[in-house]
Amino acid sequence: MLSLEKGQSLSLTKPDGSSIQKVRVGLSWDVASIGSNVDLDLFVVHKESKKVAFFNDKTAISGIKLSDDNLTGEGEGDDEFTELDATKTDDGDYYICVNIYDAKSRKQAFNLVNNAKATIYNNETNTALASYSITEDGGQNTGIIVAKLKDVGGSYEFTALGEYIVGDINEIAQVVFRK
């Protein structure tokens, strides 16, 4: 499995050059100290339609499906994930984002999170293609635009962005809409 750094991209194609039509992006994390409860929420923003799929509306975007909300990050493997079915999606780019739920009132930030990473899979074969660490330099930020799934004429390219933000889901979505 490839380990991506900020700014690196991965073409989502099969060895024969055809497009991977179904991908999954998983998010895993641990809390920095025992007894803490930090709820990270994975959500997807479709820039062109200005739609957001998140824990209260998991199917807001055609072709996108979100997993159930993991409130603690406990356990092995991916804590939350999103699936993209390219045969059902609209044209345009999809942004994979994460925020800390209710961070402002809970006085929480990414400095309370360890080992957070995003992993992209070929969901047709359940094969991990690449991972990207997202907890470096999180500091007092409460959200991050993790990656972009760029539509490149019938297939997608995954780009690790790592853009930290202080904001909730709405504020992060507004940043994406302005891109």
Curated annotation (Swiss-Prot):
| Species name | Synechocystis sp. (strain ATCC 27184 / PCC 6803 / Kazusa)
Q: What is this protein called?
A: Uncharacterized protein slr1764
The taxonomy runs:
Bacteria, Bacillati, Cyanobacteriota, Cyanophyceae, Synechococcales
What family is this? Belongs to the CAPAB/TerDEXZ family.
Q: Which Pfam families match?
A: TerD (PF02342)
Q: Which residues form a coiled coil?
A: none
